[in-house]
A protein has these predicted regions:
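P-loop/Walker A NTP-binding region and its immediately flanking N-terminal helices
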Residues: 1-186
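Extended, largely alpha-helical regulatory/partner-binding modules appended to the mid-to-C-terminal parts
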Residues: 2-5, 65, 85, 92, ...
Length: 292
């Protein structure tokens, strides 16, 4: 193979978590209650001014925020209104999904915690969107804002201009003041069931031309602890480790998990009272990287 072609292929590679990031609400796995509520709200025209998305890392908070911003600003030749049904890529969709649309402003509250950052937002909300229907502010890790910053935001949240929407995301909802929560429609994004994660990884494996053993996918799904992003990252690592054939043995070694049969052997030694053999087996498993 031409080395230049190989380099180009490598340069074009995207990690699985980005390559298979959902682009509409139908792609959000395990979040059906939220999707149902938003579908009804958009269909009836009862669209909130602010949303609070909460959940553990990797369940899709930022992705949901971008999809929601896309739905609010959806515009095609046939559709020019907010909608959950986004079958085609609209005028603003690609830029919003890639986080580069001028009217969808993303801010990481972890690095913009002060009142000055919020004052800048308050000054900007007066102005109409440049090209989209709504100016959407996505504030990630909103719990990191200072008390002053939260207080400065309250008035704008209470009476925002009709062309402005706020979407907040947080992993620590208890740190968000109740005065802010009461002004938002709250969605608790669930940990994704391991069976759903396993099924989705199998689908990705098929698209990527990767053969993955069921036990390997099951171990990855359990290790992800409800986070699809973590599952995709681990799967990515497993593919890099084993190539186009991901085995349970390789994943077990990569994750530092004990072989089930060896765990049973350890317990059998203990039940027999053979402490020396049990300690030897324990040591052997520890040396191979198993988590004690």
């Amino acid at each position: 193979m031409n080395p230049a072609g190989t380099d180009a292929k490598r340069g074009a590679y995207r990690v699985l978590a980005r390559k298979y990031r959902p682009r509409d609400f139908s792609g959000l796995i395990g979040q059906e209650p939220m999707v149902r509520t938003l579908t009804n709200a958009f269909a009836s025209g009862r669209i909130a001014q602010a949303w609070m998305l909460t959940g553990v890392r990797g369940v899709g908070k930022t992705t949901t925020a971008r999809i929601l911003a896309r739905a609010l600003n959806y515009k095609t030749a046939d559709t020019d209104q907010p909608t959950i049904l986004m079958d085609a890529i609209g005028e603003h969709c690609q830029a919003i999904l890639e986080g580069r649309h001028v009217d969808v402003i993303e801010m990481d509250a972890a690095s913009h915690t002060g009142i000055d950052d919020i004052r800048e937002i308050i000054e900007q909300v007066r102005y109409a969107p440049v090209s989209a229907r709504y100016k959407v502010y996505i504030i990630d890790e909103v719990h990191m804002l200072s008390t002053q910053a939260f207080n400065g935001l309250l008035k704008t949240l209470e009476e925002p201009p009709p062309h402005v929407k706020f979407i907040f995301a947080t992993t620590e909802i208890r740190k968000v003041p109740i005065t802010v929560l009461s002004r938002c429609q709250r969605f608790d994004l669930r940990r994704i069931d391991a069976a759903l994660i396993k099924s989705h990884l199998a689908h990705i494996g098929g698209l990527e031309g990767v053969e993955a053993e069921d036990d390997a996918l099951a171990m990855i799904a359990r290790a992800a602890e409800g986070s699809m992003r973590d599952a995709q990252s681990i799967f990515d690592q497993a593919i890099a480790h084993g190539g186009e054939n991901v085995t349970a043995e390789a994943v077990r070694s990569m994750l530092g998990l004990s072989d089930r049969n060896r765990v049973i052997d350890l317990f059998e030694h203990l039940m027999k009272g053979d402490i020396a053999a049990a300690l030897a087996e324990y040591r052997a498993q520890y040396d191979t990287g198993a988590d004690p």
